Amino acid sequence: MHRSEAIDELEWELIPASGHPAHMHMALDEVLLDRLIAGGRGPAIRFWEWTEPALVIGSHQSVMNEVDQAAARALGFTITRRMSGGGTMICEPARTITYSMYLPMSAVAGISFRQSYAALDAWAVRSFVDLSVPASYREINDIISPRGKIAGAAQARRKGFVLHHTTIAHSMDVQLVAQLIRIGRDRLSERGVRSAEKEVSPLSWFTKLSCAEVTAHMERSFEAAFAARRSALSPSELEQARGLVDTKYATPGWIERLP
C-alpha cells in the first residue's frame, strides 16, 4: 500500500453526508474543486447521500454503449455524467456510499498516478478492516474483498489540483448490473471508454451495519486519521452548484456529449 506523507500533512475539512439529487452531486464536485483552486476553500473530503437511484457514467464514456436507457427509465434511474473518468456506477439511496476528496496535486507528488489511487483510499480500506471486512486494494482503482469489488475510484485533475472520488456498494441487487449496464453487449457507438466487467462484493455481505452507520463510521475514521475538522457546504457553494445543474449537468448537451 502506497501512501504519500504529504496527504497526512494537509489541514483537512470534513463535510458530512448531505442528501442531494444526482446532478447536484456532480455539480458540487466541480464547484468545490474550483473553490479549492481559487483559494476559497482548503483541502476537503465530502461524503454524499444519494436521494434518488442514479447511473453515473464517466466523463469519457458513451451513453449508448454503457447504459440501457430503456431499462433505466423503467426502473426510475437518473442518468448523469461526472467530470472524472472511469466506468459506470450504479448508485441507490441507503445502498451506496460515496465520498469525494479535493486536494492539491503536490500532496501526491513523488508517487505515480496509479499509486495515488491507493494512497488516497488507504484510510477507507483501514476503516473497512476495522469493521472486520476483509478489504484490500487492487490497482488501479478498486477496493476489493476475496469475493469481488467493494468500491471503485475515479479522478479528475485540473490546474494542479485533484478531485478523487470513490463509490462503495453497501448493498446491491447484483442483477441490476446486467439490466442497466451494457457490459458485454455490442457497441452502439464507436466513441467512449467501456466499463470493465467485475464481480460486485457489497459491504453488507460482511457487516450488519446500515449504510448510514457505515458512512458515520467512515467519517469518524477519516477524522481520526487526519485530524480533520467538520465543515459544511456554504450557501454560495450550493447556489453555484444549482446553477451548474441547470446550465450543464442536467442538460442533454453534457449527459449525451458522447452519444
Name every feature range the model reports, one short phrase each.
Residues 69, 89, 94-222, 247, ...:
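Catalytic beta-strand/loop module used to bind and position nucleotide/cofactor moieties
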Residues 76-96:
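Glycine/serine-rich anion-binding loops at beta->alpha junctions
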Residues 1-70, 74, 78, 82, ...:
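Active-site loop/lid in soluble adenylation, ligation, and acyl-transfer enzymes
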